[in-house]
Amino acid sequence: MFWRARTTSGRAICLSDQFPGIKVEEVMRGRVTFVGLPPVDLGTDVDWTANPHGNRSWALNLHALRWAGRLVAEYERTGEPAYLDSASALIAHWIRENPRDRPGVSPWAWAEHAVALRAPALVCLSEHVRTPALWDSLAEHGEILADPSLYRQGHNHGLDQDIALLVVGCRLGRARWRDLAIRRMTASAELAIDAQGVLHEQAPRYGLYVHRRLGVALRAIRESGAEPPQRLVARRAALEAYIAHATQPDGRLVSIGDSPADARADGFRHEGPVVRVFEGGYVFGRTAWDDPRSAYYSIRFGPGRRLHGHEDHLGVTYMAQGRRILVEAGFHSYERTGFVEWTRSPQAHNVPVVTGVFKPGKATRLIGSSIGPSRQSFELADDAYGVTRTRRVLVGHGPDLMAVHDSVARGTLRSLWHFDPALEVVSRGDGRVVLGDGDWRVTLLHFPGAGQAVRPGLVCPGYLRTAEAVTVLSPEAAGVLTVIVPGADAPRVSVSGDVMTVHTPGGPVQLPYSQST
């Protein structure tokens, strides 16, 4: 039985505004909804080993107990004692049923991220009720969070561990835990975020998550009575440029790595150049800020795949005229399935795939670039297939056009192009594919054209969602030129010497061209 706390060991820093929204009355009846999956009736005698959807994220959310923490927040907001009583009973039941040394306990109960997310909920509860079991559990959580062998340095989980350790340390009056948390999160931020703001987890969505969580961390540090380290403040500020440039004109983050295609990033400052090269492995370009019809593109290079990254090096995405054109398969989920594994493979991205054996984790070099107001070009190379493959990307604005030349030193390659699900094939032939959405058209041209293929594919418009999409494969060759012309239905192309002229709706565009490509 919980009893009202009259004394505390230290200050309770309750981060209740960070708990997810819930349907309070449903939770009071024992029904929960996590990660957009159908509701589950837990009842009053919760089976903590349950995972009815067989979903890793669902199980994590169950054991994180942030949904119970939200009941505490609702009690604080409304004064309704039933909410606090329900949260107290749920957390007491979890503590009783999930001792670390008991066989058969869910592996998610003491997973490092579950511990980090759950501890702040226990702290919030401790502001209103107190039992030996709750205090013992807080101490146990603190010991785990302080354990260097369980710490995820340079990872978003590590940041959550530090936030949790800080608030537990303050609650239990253990200043050494608070100080350890601040030291670790500062060192971890400098490892995870480079001076330009690129997060080494290789997914813009995680840049957004870490930025938000660092904001929580800075607030918790101040509430603890300490001064936030300026090094930590600076790394959080640096993230803002990376997030802003990774945000497409439609307000959604570009779906690179484990970034859901429907994730939004609003409100970030975006002054400065419209094209920026981030040495951590990204080129982001657009024609204008704050214009939903702006052209936009991304290019991937840099260190090999790590953490939340995909095998997307040399990959591009492209928007123009208010339309998504080239997309990638994107992020589906954290489930361990063949499809999810495929979404992380080169074949799920707009890249040249060389005939041969792929060598994962290879870095890609940005060899050169030329950035002008209406035309930019970039050259990249790597040896991901044991042989040098090179990609040259040219993007033109006004008129809009993207041209990509892929080549391999030995052997052959095929370039893959994944189109937005809104686009359907209107016509095809002779190395040309015209796609459309309503009356709007975009044309893909291949040189050489013989052997081009069009296949049905799948992309992920959101978490656990798939949509049918068109995938175009270039002919197999040692070198292939791909030209994307937005707003055009089979534009005329002419060649004179080593110059190709593409007659777009906005006017002619000239490209360097070799008959041998």
Model features per residue range: what roles?
Residues 34-59, 72-78:
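Asp/Glu-centered strand-loop micro-motifs enriched in Gly/Pro and often flanked by an aromatic residue
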